[in-house]
Regions:
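Alpha-helical elements of Rossmann-like donor-binding domains used by nucleotide-donor carbohydrate transfer enzymes
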Residues: 18-21, 59-60, 92, 96-99
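Short, conserved loop/helix-junction motifs that constitute active-site signature segments
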Residues: 32-37, 67-68
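Catalytic active-site module of serine/aspartate enzymes centered on a nucleophile-bearing elbow/loop
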Residues: 26, 68-104
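Active-site nucleophile elbow and catalytic-triad environment of alpha/beta-hydrolase enzymes
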Residues: 7, 11-33
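Structured catalytic core of nucleotide-sugar glycosyltransferases
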Residues: 44, 58-59, 74-77
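Divalent metal-coordination and catalytic microenvironments
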Residues: 1
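Short beta-strand/loop motif that positions the catalytic acidic residue
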Residues: 37, 43-45, 49
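Conserved alpha/beta-hydrolase "acid-adjacent" motif
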Residues: 50-60
């Protein structure tokens, strides 16, 4: 992953702004007051994903969303990074995702 020539490129300031606003909006309580609390939610991340603060941020998001959803699940893949659907455990990730969709 680190040696991939398509990774590690410089991103625009706009991308960072969009990401920051998305993270900020994810933690705004008023956005969750008028939604269906019974919809299934699955949070997927790699344990080595710096975007998810090496799983700590992902766990914080999960704990926050548990206040609003009755059917919330989290799956953190050990030793995977950000793109779990194309990482070393992609078969396991797709299998778990398929199972979640089929039982949701």
């Amino acid at each position: 992953y680190v040696n991939d020539e398509l990774c590690g490129y410089k991103v625009t300031n706009g991308l960072w702004m969009d990401m920051a606003q998305g993270i900020e909006n994810a933690f705004k309580i008023y956005d969750y007051n008028n939604i269906n609390k019974n919809i299934p939610v699955l949070i997927i991340s790699g344990s080595e994903d710096p975007v998810g603060n090496f799983k700590r941020g992902v766990i914080s998001l999960y704990n926050f969303l548990r206040n609003f959803f009755t059917n919330i699940n989290i799956k953190i893949y050990k030793d995977e990074r950000h793109e779990v659907f194309s990482g070393n455990k992609k078969r396991e990730v797709y299998k778990s995702f398929k199972s979640f969709i089929e039982t949701a």
